[in-house]
Each structure stands twice: as C-alpha cells, then as structure tokens.
Amino acid sequence: MLFIFDRPGRYAFWMKGMKFPLDFIWISGDKITEITGKVGIDQMNLRPQQPVDKILEVNSSWAAEHQIKIGDTVKYESVSN
C-alpha cells in the first residue's frame, strides 16, 4: 500500500491489527531514503529518520528480495477507478 502525503513529515506508523510483518519503504520526492525491514506485528510508532512524503508498505523481505536500496529512484503511475 502506498501512502502519499501533501507535505513531507516524520509520520508515525504502527502495526495495530496486522497479522503479518511488513517492510516499510520511506520515500522523499522520487528517492528511497530509508527501508525498515521485517516490521513485526507488535511494533508501534515507527517513524523515518528524516521527513518523507510517501511511505510504501510491502510484504516482509520484499525489499531485500527485489534488491531495493536507499537512493533508488521510485516511479509510479496513478490508477483510476
């Protein structure tokens, strides 16, 4: 799931109600600034080190399996209903 914010910030995320771990990919502009891998179901108040305007949640270990790295450029397209 991709979260897009109007302005950069150090937004807090937590895993309430999740039944499986995730990776958090923190994005500023079009660059990955941080990756928090294997976020457990009991973790609360996760924040990036620096302000971001997007956060991508993916299945645990997905980032490593796909060789996603800090500094990588992110491209995405809008999807209409």
What residue ranges belong to the model's regions?
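Compact, glycine-rich, soluble single-domain proteins
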Residues: M1-N81
